């Protein structure tokens, strides 16, 4: 990390301000050359002109110097606040490169912060999640995680496991000495409690991931029941073609919209029916895949048409799902000839006239998901909690069987999974994978 890196830290495009960030051993040197200053006071905003090596002015800027180790990365950092737009920040960045800086890789500032002990990998993930959060509620959950509650809990569990492992491995070396029975009971209880905590974290995170990612909603029904009309009504604009011709929608259409504070990702699927049309068959297959991925299903039926075998197939398709289903009887403004043989609690509406009742029902359901409890949005961390929980649970059983070597193996597995997020580490390939999806300048 001896080189000095530079990047534009703000989004590209026209705006009032752009920020260019510089980090590394030569950051102060480059800043002094650009500004023609002889010194900079750390943490003080300095208004200055910036010049290129031909002594031509680049822009006027506010320049802030953060002296190591009291900076985001733990290195010397200089931030240039300049005028926004497409060109000025690029010109400044090119000048920094000509002075000897290197263009930063995606997430490299955060990676350096981790390597220099300024933050844990877990906090870095939380920062990235906060940047990408899609709703105010998601931001609230992630900001709460950043306060350290989750990190402290995971580190406490890891520390408990390390202490236990140290004792057990010592006991393996001195196998002739009997372990006190009450100590075995304490270890067993510790394993049970920590396994349960980790299981609660990953199950809660899985069940409420829609709060952070946005709830996926799939609209399903046979052809020509008004699925596309319902999609358009929910979006409040015409996104899908509405036609009396059955099979108009042959592919899945996905859009996002806000309902109250919740982000919804809604998918209009191709009508499900038997068809010899190859393209339509592919659309039906995609529809069934969308149902598997959805958090909520809107099952649409036509009030003006007699229930038939295609309707029955929809009922059969949804019979064993554990997803939340809203049963919708569309076109209820027309003569109602649909017989509710399945005794479903239908919401009666006309997608082309008024869907207020559906929106109210949806919002009431979404509001029932509170944001309390510890939740994580990183799939990698959710999997780590799951793997650790299961390993600790297996270890408890092995302890009861006095299989101490296998007990130690399972505990090691859990410790290593948790340590990836709670402890500093030097494995660059893991860091590269973790920060590869971060923004430039972050």
Swiss-Prot record:
Cofactors required: K(+)
The enzyme's E.C. designation: 3.6.-.-
CDD domains: trmE, TrmE_N
Binding site for K(+): 224, 243, 245, 248
Keywords: Cytoplasm, GTP-binding, Hydrolase, Magnesium, Metal-binding, Nucleotide-binding, Potassium, tRNA processing
Gene Ontology cellular component list: cytosol
GO MF terms, alphabetically ordered: GTP binding; GTPase activity; metal ion binding
UniProt GO BP: tRNA methylation; tRNA wobble uridine modification
Binding residue positions for Mg(2+): 228, 249
Span of domain TrmE-type G: 214-367
Residue positions binding (6S)-5-formyl-5,6,7,8-tetrahydrofolate: 21, 79, 118, 442
PANTHER family, A to Z: TRNA MODIFICATION GTPASE GTPBP3, TRNA MODIFICATION GTPASE GTPBP3, MITOCHONDRIAL
Alphabetical list of HAMAP family matching this protein: GTPase_MnmE
NCBIfam families with a match to the protein in the record: mnmE_trmE_thdF (TIGR00450), small_GTP (TIGR00231)
Subunit structure, interactors included: Homodimer. Heterotetramer of two MnmE and two MnmG subunits.
Protein's name in the database: tRNA modification GTPase MnmE
Species, as recorded: Campylobacter jejuni (strain RM1221)
Source taxonomy: Bacteria, Pseudomonadati, Campylobacterota, Epsilonproteobacteria, Campylobacterales
């Amino acid at each position: 990390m001896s080189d000095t890196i530079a990047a534009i830290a703000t989004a590209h495009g026209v705006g009032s301000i752009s920020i260019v960030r510089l980090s590394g051993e030569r950051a102060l040197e480059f800043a002094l050359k650009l500004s023609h200053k002889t010194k900079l006071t750390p943490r003080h905003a300095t208004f200055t002109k910036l010049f290129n090596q031909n002594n031509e002015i680049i822009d006027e800027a506010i320049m802030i110097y953060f002296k190591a180790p009291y900076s985001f990365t733990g290195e010397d950092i200089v931030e240039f606040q300049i005028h926004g737009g497409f060109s000025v920040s690029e010109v400044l960045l090119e000048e920094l490169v000509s002075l000897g800086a290197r263009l930063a890789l995606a997430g490299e500032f955060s990676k350096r912060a981790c390597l220099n002990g300024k933050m844990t990998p877990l906090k870095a993930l939380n920062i990235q999640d906060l940047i990408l959060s899609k709703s105010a509620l998601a931001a609230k959950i992630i900001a709460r995680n950043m306060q350290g509650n989750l990190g402290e809990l995971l580190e406490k569990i890891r520390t408990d496991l390390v202490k236990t492992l140290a004792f057990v491995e010592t006991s393996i070396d001195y196998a002739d000495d009997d372990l006190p029975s009450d100590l075995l009971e304490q270890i067993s209880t510790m394993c049970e409690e920590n396994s349960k905590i980790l299981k609660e974290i990953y199950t809660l995170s899985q069940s409420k991931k829609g709060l952070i990612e946005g709830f996926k909603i799939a609209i399903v029904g046979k052809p020509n029941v008004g699925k596309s009309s319902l999609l358009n009504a929910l979006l409040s604009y015409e996104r899908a073609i509405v036609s009396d011709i059955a099979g108009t929608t042959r592919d899945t259409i996905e859009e996002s919209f806000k309902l109250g504070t919740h982000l919804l990702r809604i998918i209009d699927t191709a009508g499900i029916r038997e068809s010899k049309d190859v393209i339509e068959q592919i659309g039906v297959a995609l529809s069934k895949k969308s149902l598997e991925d959805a958090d909520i299903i809107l099952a649409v039926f036509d009030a003006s048409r007699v229930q038939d075998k295609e309707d029955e197939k929809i009922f059969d398709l949804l019979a064993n799902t554990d997803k939340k289903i809203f049963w919708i009887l569309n076109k209820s403004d027309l003569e109602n000839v649909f017989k509710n043989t399945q005794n479903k609690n239908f919401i009666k509406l006309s997608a082309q006239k008024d869907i207020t009742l559906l929106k109210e029902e949806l919002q009431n359901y979404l509001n029932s998901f509170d944001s309390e409890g510890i939740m994580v949005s990183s799939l990698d961390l959710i999997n780590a909690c799951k793997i650790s929980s299961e390993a600790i649970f297996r270890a408890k059983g092995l302890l009861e069987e006095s299989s101490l070597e296998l007990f130690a193996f399972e505990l090691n597995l859990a410790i290593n999974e948790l340590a990836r997020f709670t402890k500093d580490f030097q494995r660059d390939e893991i860091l590269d994978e973790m920060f590869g999806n971060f923004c430039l300048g972050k």
